[in-house]
Amino acid sequence: MKKCFVVMGFGEKPDYATGRTLDLDKTYRTIIKRAVEEAGLECIRADTVIHSGTIDTPMYQLLLEADVVVADLSTSNANAIYELGVRHALRPHTTIVIAEKQFKFPFDLGHLLILPYEHLGKGIEFEEVERMRAALVTAIKTLVEKPATDSPVYTFLPALQPPSTAPAPVVQGFAAAVDGLVA
């Protein structure tokens, strides 16, 4: 099954640009996870990855190997913006950026296509959840079927070749061990 790695903050986080607090877990549960699964992909967020040690190794591996990455930049989370940059350096396509409508994006992100949604802070209206979920399903299916360059790195450096996405042996062994425990 194809995989989608979700880049975003967790829990309730302050949006310092607007002074609001956004429940990012609600965005994940009601919009992103549902859309990814409806599009037929496995949805993975860093806080759901079983690992030993630091999250860095599986995070970098997922940024490289995921068939699709959805990055929610709503609260200008530095980690999410950094991970988006890493993804853009590693893969030329299949990266989707979303953000709450009041998101004040940094200048360097101004050229990206960012799918907006309206967040009310603690919640999201049902109609908005359904609208954004449908838009995200369409975006995911379109990118999986017809990948187009969405990375500024590969747009401006067209001769650049992405690294191999063959799974690392250590992580393959770890995944096999986890599968053995679950089975």
Model-found features: residue ranges?
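Cross-kingdom TIR/SEFIR domain
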Residues: 60, 73-142
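Conserved N-terminal substructure of TIR/SEFIR domains
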Residues: 1-51, 62-66
